[in-house]
From Swiss-Prot:
Keywords, in A-Z order: G-protein coupled receptor, Glycoprotein, Membrane, Receptor, Sensory transduction, Taste, Transducer, Transmembrane, Transmembrane helix
Lineage, uppermost ranks: Eukaryota, Metazoa, Chordata, Craniata, Vertebrata
Residue positions the entry lists as glycosylated: 170
Full protein name: Taste receptor type 2 member 109
GO molecular function: bitter taste receptor activity; G protein-coupled receptor activity
GO cellular component labels: membrane
Organism whose genome encodes this protein: Mus musculus (Mouse)
PANTHER family, per the entry: TASTE RECEPTOR TYPE 2 (PTHR11394), TASTE RECEPTOR TYPE 2 MEMBER 109 (PTHR11394:SF25)
Cytoplasmic face of the membrane: 36-62, 116-135, 213-241, 292-316
């Protein structure tokens, strides 16, 4: 019975790892395509709009994050003792935190940009921010850098505490599995705390966009008869983008919370593989949501698909 259970776990883990590899490749293609299209447009026009800058920076940060995951998983599987040394735990935890933090905050800046550009409020504070979208985005990124510095500082303090606790028992440069797991849980806890800030900010923009759409719809019912106007359509498109971001981001956060609360399951390879698949869905699939929403990216993707479809005829 134990042999059958182990065999089932092994098969499940292998299937999940294959799915993970496919997810990483899909994410690299989507984010690489986004960055390439905007960079080519920048070279052609000699300028880049704010939203394109955010999209390019977001895609670039996710490419780095996905490559880090793609390279890191095989190394951790083939050389498990290497990744549990003091230096490697600090290096990989810090690098993952930086890559993920930057990726999440650029996506949050995109939500803030959509809100300020599309929402319609008459109060003076909103109009003041609306006229200074670039400054608002710059300040948001500056705040994210301060939080990143605090996150890394707290992260290294927790890792050092974990290392010192282990050294009191057995002086060695290698973590045994229990203390390696304990260190990972502390890293996750710290990361979840700092991720709550962009979650609250994105959720606030989402709720304010809904309120703006509701007030606009109410005004239209009083003065205009007919279907949607351009502003209403823009509201719906912005809401779709923010909903997709919040949905994928919520799944990502729930995965981290699950790993934090049920940390005993992190000893099970299938559970680790499952969490990695869920974590990777956010940076991989969100890029395709942005491609479908952006007219330039959508047209470029259709051109590439058309070229790929016609290519076999040219080869013949």
């Amino acid at each position: 019975m134990e042999h059958l259970l182990k065999r089932t776990f092994d098969i499940t883990e292998n299937i999940l790892l294959i799915i993970l590899f496919i997810e990483l490749i899909i994410g690299l293609i989507g984010n690489g395509f986004t960055a390439l299209v905007h960079c080519m447009d920048w070279v052609k026009r000699k300028k880049m709009s704010l939203v394109n800058k955010i999209l390019t920076a977001l895609a670039t940060s996710r490419i780095f994050l996905l490559w880090f995951m793609l390279v890191g998983f095989p190394i951790s599987s083939l050389y498990p003792y290497l990744v549990t040394t003091r230096l490697m735990i600090q290096f990989t935890s810090t690098l993952w935190t930086i890559a993920n933090h930057i990726s999440v905050w650029f996506a949050t800046c995109l939500s803030v940009f959509y809100f300020l550009k599309i929402a319609n409020f008459s109060n003076s504070p909103f109009l003041y921010l609306k006229r200074r979208v670039e400054k608002v985005v710059s300040v948001t990124l500056l705040v994210s850098l301060v939080l990143l510095f605090l996150n890394i500082l707290l992260l290294n303090l927790e890792i050092n505490m974990c290392i010192n606790e282990y050294h009191q028992i057995n002086i060695s440069y290698i973590f045994i599995s229990y203390y390696h797991l304990s260190c990972q849980i502390q890293v996750l806890g710290s990361h979840i705390i700092f991720l709550s800030v962009p979650v609250v900010l994105s959720l606030s923009t989402f709720l304010l966009l809904i309120f703006s759409l509701w007030t606009l719809h109410k005004r239209m019912q009083q003065h205009v008869q007919g279907g949607r106007d351009a502003r209403t359509t823009a509201h719906f498109k912005a809401l779709q983008a923010v909903i997709a971001f919040l949905l994928l981001y919520s799944i990502f956060i729930l995965s981290l919370l699950l790993q934090f609360w049920i940390h005993g399951l992190r000893k099970k390879p299938p559970f680790i593989a499952f969490c990695q698949v869920v974590d990777t869905a956010f940076p991989s699939f969100h890029s395709y949501v942005l491609i479908l929403r952006d007219r330039k990216l959508r047209h470029a993707s259709l051109s590439v698909l058309s070229w790929l479809k016609c290519r076999p005829n040219y080869v013949k």
